[in-house]
Amino acid sequence: MVVDSDATSVRRKSLLVFALLFLVGCASAVEGPLVDRRGWVIHREFLPHSKASNKKVELLWTQPAGDGPWPAVLFIHGHQLVRDGGEAYVKTGALGLMARRGYVAAAVSQPGYGNSDGPADFCGPFTKDAVLTAIAFLRKQPSVSPNKTALYGYSRGAIVASMVATQDQELAAVILGGGAYDFFKWYPTPLAGIDANIKFESGLSDEAFKARSALYHAEKIQSPILLLHGTNDERVPLQQARAFAAKLQANHIPIRGRIRGRCMINLFTPE
């Protein structure tokens, strides 16, 4: 029989206490407000998904001091190696920054990211409906001007935001950065990893591609669009933004574009 020494016993007890504290910390991380690096309080909500009430949609949001109402902006992240979802915008201080500028600022976690229930469907209908769930919540807040709600989507988030805009005609503005708007022309993509994710999460059917390609639904968009893209974007060729812009212009949608020489300009957080 092996008998533990006092030192070994103490070490094991210390590790047990550490593990318990770690688990408690993980549990508390998904409940209650957060505080960003500049001390701004961020609220965390778990909303029932509009098409699957047993699944939750994570929304993080904050507002300026005072009563409002204020315009609102909802951020939609791209793919992440560390899948922290909307919390990325808390860590960078983006939500607090926008609140100081007079906006109700929010970030939604796409299904399969952060604390939002999956599965991830590569910018598909389940993700689109999760974003619509978040928008509906924001518009009901007394601090929000419901007719002044805007979206900012980056990469995958831009794909989702563009499809949301085909369904929600009341959006005040939509900012799309580095997105793909025609899956038929994009696939196969420049990166094998993206191809694998598309095949696994959405499948390769015409129906799946059309459900994620805003170019084929552009006539339904009513909101002003700002397109941001990079000439050397390694994920999505610039032609995707140009073709989408031409389609929007043909439908008389107010549009502005900004092209950067090397890569997509990302105002708040890296993918």
Region roles according to the model:
Residues G68-W70, G78-D117:
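Short substrate-entry loop that stabilizes the transition state in hydrolases
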Residues V144-S155:
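Alpha/beta-hydrolase fold nucleophile elbow
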Residues V30-D67:
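N-terminal cap/lid segment of alpha/beta-hydrolase-fold proteins
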Residues R242, Q249-E271:
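C-terminal catalytic histidine-bearing segment of alpha/beta-hydrolase fold enzymes
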Residues D121-P142:
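Alpha/beta-hydrolase active-site loop
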Residues I221, L227-H229, D233:
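Short beta-strand/loop motif that positions the catalytic acidic residue
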